[in-house]
Amino acid sequence: MSSNGSDLGHNNRRNEKGNPDSVHSSMRGSMSSTRRKSINFQNQLQLALESNECDVMYCSLSSGRFRAPNGENFPPHGGKLKLSPLEKYDDANRGVPPPSPAPNSDCFATCVANQLPSQSCSVGSAKPETSVMQKHGMAGNGMVGSGMSGNGMAANGTNYHQRGVSPNSRYRLERYRESQSTPQSKLMDNMGGMPSAVPSVSATRLLLPSNVPLPLAQCENYNAYLGSTVHTPVKRYVPTPPPAMELYSDLSISSSPAANLPTPAAAVASSASTSASAMQSQYANMPYNYRSKCCHSEASHGSLSRTSQTYASCSPACTSPSPAPSTSMSMVFSAASSCSPIMTATSSARSGNHRGDDSDSVIVVPPGGGAMAQIEAENPSGTCLHCNTVRRTTGVHQTTQTTGPISPVPISLPVPMAMPVMSGLNEQMPSQSLESSMVSVQAKRLEGGGNMAVPPGSNQHQLYRSQMASNPRLQHIHHQTQQHQSLQVLPQPQNHHLSCKKRIGMYMRRTTSQFFGVEPSTEAADCALWQGRHRRLAIRCFGMFDTELEYHMQQAIGGGNEDAGQSNGTNGNYAPDRPDILPVQDAIGMDMTMSGDSRRQKCYTNRDFLAGEFVERKASVGYMFVAMVSYLVHMFNKRRPIQMHRVRCPWQWSRSFAPIHVQSHSNQQTDADGCLTDGLEAIIDDEVFFDSPCEITTSAVNDESSDIGRQAAKPRPCADQSGVGVSVYMAERQQNGWRTSALNSGGNATSDINLTGDQSSHQPGAAHIPLCSSVSSQMQPAMRSSHSTTSTCNRGNRITAQLLDGVLENSRRPPLRCIKYFSVNDLDDRTDHRPFFTYWINTVQVVVLILSIICYGIAPIGIGSEQKTGQVLVTSLSLQTVQHVEQRNLWIGPRNIDLVHMGAKFAACMRRDIKITEVVTKTRRHERETACCIRNDDSGCVQSSQAECSIRGLYPTKSISTWKKWSPSESGPGGRISGSVCGLDPKFCDAPASIAPYEWPDDITKWPICRKTNSFTQRYRYKDHTSEHMVCEVIGHPCCTGLYGECRITTREYCDFIKGYFHEEASLCSQISCLNNVCGMFPFISVETPDQLYRLLTSLCMHAGILHLAITLIFQHLFLADLERLIGTVRTAIVYIMSGFAGNLTSAILVPHRPEVGPSASLSGVVASLIALLVWMHWKYLHKPHIALFKLLLLCSVLVGIGTLPYQLNFLGLLAGVICGCLLTMSLVPFTTFSKYGRKKKINLIWTCVLFHVVVYTAMIVTFYIHPSEFHSISFVDMFSNSNGYDNFTNADHHGVDVVSSNTRYSQTQNSQYYYHHHSDDIIRKSVTFTEKALVSHILYPTAPRKTSAQQWQEVEYSRSFNHLSNYSDRIKKSIGNISKLKQVFTSPIRFSNKNNHSNLMTELTSVHSENKQKYLGYINNNTEFNVL
């Protein structure tokens, strides 16, 4: 700062003496330099436009007002042009040159010593309006001169140019050196008495006319920022002179008045002087992309070179004639007075990942019509200023540049010019080193020492022709230029615009290859990335790595990641973007000691953290939820308001600089003799909140480990350390002193925990010694035990820990007893995937279960069945005690029929089942024989068979009810004999009407549901006896019950009691589809054909109960999340869904009649995926792989055991999920094969697995739909029938009913409605022959006559139950003797017929009871056939 101030004042005094007109400019530059010391200061370019002075950029601007582009007016002598503000800290005046591999030719003075005599700028009366195009902010040094924008110009026409300071140098504090000042007397002696001009703070700018377009986009590169005092070796500079050849190709000249800018390949400089007429000028940014490779005569450089130079000092004058073998170009424009030409230069682009702001070039171009161009070829003898600067710094001639950006405009693209331009430069490849070109444009020396004064009205073409006529070489150059431009357009490759279809195809191919990991362009980087992910998965799930094998894997991953990090081209350091965080001591090899049970070692690290900026760990979903709940609790709990501020995120920092144990990784090479950056000793000495590295003595270590400990304690260079670091815990502190014992032994490897090591090896195969492998695993416990007693740290005892905690209370440090770790868990999210699919599937499963419990309730809890009894109104218009059986649910969830209704896996709802179809067909055949049973007292009617209508507890007479059946003698409408139907008649239905050709058939099972009935029945209610079935009140309607769509006609009360689906709009069971009601979901496309194949997927989101869901969530949180962190969301979803699909499809084929829910097959596929990765990827790298395999196999056995419980998937489905998950993992995960990896092998494996899955799934679907009965002979149901709780009945068995009368006390039996009601036993049973237990439920017991005494009726003991409950087994055993005799009676069909129709015959069937020999009377209707099935 002192040097800057001294230089500033000295320059002001020099300027005041040399040029009195520039005093005002120097004072304003001084104030501007002082103001720019602030951090967020916005540089302003002040333009002093006086009537009697010649500014640098405007040679003939008259006095007056300066008008900005936005219309903002400025007073004279005080106009300001605002530039874009600096976004970063500006310390340009501090004189701290940063280190850089770029050429050390940045802060040099560029001047052109012209032999032209000085001439003052003429002053015109016009007031030109100059439009200025504002671009990047100027990174300046020194003073800001009035009206200066890149070049300082003295009165004698000599121009000065000084390179701007790099913005990134403001954050490089590695080197602090005193700035050196150069005596101004020596400078003036060298300059020959030329008055100095104040240098500007930015680069040269181009001043163009308003009609000239600006096609160029500014190219970012790293501008001048390194002074000559910093002796930094230049990379990749060849100390050989360049070949003697022409460095520039031909010049292309165009006379078009509408001029464009030259290409970025050649930076063109020109000098301009404005005419008397007020013409507008314009700024344009000239990117620094090329520098001329020139090295010619060095004779005349001499004393003009400067030995030392600082940021605050002025730039000296230095002559730089054009190269001898090349051609220089001078442009002289006509004006009232001329100014000296301006020379522009560009700096080499900085290599690496650091970015820099561009310094803008300014070139003065006069308006068209008032300027004349002149070109000449010279062979001067001079020196190369650029090469001389490099030689002065490094002693090596620079021929190439390390790296640099490519011009945004193609070099070979011809651009029309209004002035001569440099063209024909060879196009550079992106990977090659580029050299920024420096074009020196000089004015032609006037003959006789005078200036060339061209009249304003002269013609440019005439002057150009005269110049060409006098110079033959210029004619040859012009001819070659025109020929080159004509030939340049023809062979130029055209950019073919691909069609949208081709672009989409290319994108899909590239995306697919990247998804499978077989993209050749990114194979190396992807391999290193996946290797790191595999290691982290192995440590999380499988255990620790073996020490030696881990070292080799670390080296392989390190090299790949280094290459990948270097290819990104982004700045990996947080310092340039975070000015509040200072670079800190490199903590490689430093250890951290902790005590207690919270010690945790994980010998791995993440290279992305080392190569990139420090990004702290993302908060998990669970933590955010807990934090939200905790915040709400503390908000409503006002009892502890003081501790409210402690509820904070434990991984946020509010420090202005990071502690010393946080590593700052740099892309630059580190010196081999030390790891500390220069200038940070003061920060480390003043560190009070964190311990400095402590020394450890190895004398207390055991004898067998002393050598190892001493060897590990030796200091190692930072560049050679690629050790494996472990977690650093922030909250574990020892409260013995006022410093926290965070760090110990900067270079020792004998402490508890090592920080993350630097792995910035520049070669993938470089051998480095990891920290964790320098000490054997056997000797580490002994060294840890002795470390707590032998380590000595510098601690103070003046400030207590409690007081320190109070001081640090405002900082966002972790709370006590909360571990914060950097290098392990914080870095997993850098390259690993977030388990979004795990979060999503868990959320869906929880929501589905909650909604199912809310809508359907919870079934009886337990194993087995439960009986429910109640009194309901039945079709006989009497109260009956109905017993209903329900299956219990072990998992605390809905019933099985509700699960099927919500989308459980159930084969009957997915395809047409043969057995269900047979039972439905049988039911419809019996329904054709039914008719309307009308009560004679007009109490109602119901559709029933003749037996049910005649036998209702009384003798078969017509006094109670009439069974109205159409016959040939008494036919229905249209001669129909099928019917009648209660409440349904084609004659009285208007919609749909029975008219030709849509007449209703003579089959009541094919009649539709009538949506509209006419009023004929009410008018002729007592006159027309044929409409009695239409005027009666219909008591019973179809009710769908059971799991297989059983239908019976009953009352609404009874249907609600058994939780069935009541259809009041229908009259017959054939009019509805009970299976469609039971299955739910989307209706069938065809009513008779189930097609809900999507149940194979919907069942994955369903659970049988709360316990089932808890088990699933635990599995998915522990294993599915880890797998998703490795392979990503899409691959995890494919493995999860396809494994579940395969398992459910296999179970549906083998066990079709059992509802199953849950993702058991998917979990099996996930576990199988982990097993495959363990066996084929991590087996030889793990320390104890057998233990990890045993744990995973134990989990598989747990899943198989869960599959034996009710509502769970069969074990064959689990096996299918295991096979599918294993194959999908090997095909989807990149760089995973069964043998040594190869790209062609991987592609073949992918195709093999994909084709295998397609073939297997197709075969299984064909088997499931086309040949569903192939596996019916395999009794998979009976295999686990006892454990699953499924026996030979379902919840549809509710037969035993007791008729209760309030007048008389008696009981009687009602016949089962088996004629049109099929039972679940018929579907599940494998054979036609009934067991003795099943026979009881299907025997039609004869009805006993009324007894005179209720006591006598109660003495009769026989089975009156039609169910199979266990509490009725004693009654069945007592009546086993009667059942054996009943078998003999009903073994053959019995037909009773009578000539007299409508007459009843009574047949007495006697059977002797073992106790009371009671007689049983059976009343069987005539014309009725009874078969014992």
From Swiss-Prot:
Q: Which UniProt keywords apply?
A: Endoplasmic reticulum, Membrane, Protein transport, Transmembrane, Transmembrane helix, Transport
Record family assignment: Belongs to the peptidase S54 family.
Q: Does the keyword Transmembrane apply?
A: yes
Q: Name one GO cellular component term.
A: endoplasmic reticulum
Q: Which GO terms describe its biological process?
A: negative regulation of epidermal growth factor receptor signaling pathway; positive regulation of circadian sleep/wake cycle, wakefulness; protein transport; regulation of epidermal growth factor receptor signaling pathway; regulation of protein secretion
Renumbered to this chain, the Low complexity biased-composition regions fall at: 22-33
Effect of gene knockout: Flies display a severe decrease in daytime activity pattern and an increase in sleeping periods.
Instruction: Describe the function of this protein.
Output: Rhomboid protease-like protein which has no protease activity but regulates the secretion of several ligands of the epidermal growth factor receptor. Indirectly activates the epidermal growth factor receptor signaling pathway and may thereby regulate sleep, cell survival, proliferation and migration.
| Residue intervals annotated with topology Cytoplasmic | 1-843, 1121-1131, 1178-1186, 1232-1245
| Name assigned to this protein | Inactive rhomboid protein 1
Q: Which SUPFAM superfamilies match?
A: Rhomboid-like (SSF144091)
Q: Which species is listed as the source?
A: Drosophila melanogaster (Fruit fly)
Q: Which residues cross the membrane?
A: 844-864, 1100-1120, 1132-1152, 1157-1177, 1187-1207, 1211-1231, 1246-1266
- The residue ranges flagged as biased composition, category Polar residues, are 564-573, 740-763
The superkingdom of the source organism is Eukaryota
- Tissue specificity comment: Specifically expressed in the nervous system and in brain.
The reply to whether Metal-binding figures as a keyword in the UniProt entry is no
Q: Which residues lie on this side of the membrane: Lumenal?
A: 865-1099, 1153-1156, 1208-1210, 1267-1429
Annotated segments matching region Disordered: 1-36, 560-579, 740-766
What's the main place this protein lives?
Answer: endoplasmic reticulum
Regarding the membrane, this protein is recorded as: Multi-pass membrane protein
Q: Report the subcellular localization.
A: Endoplasmic reticulum membrane
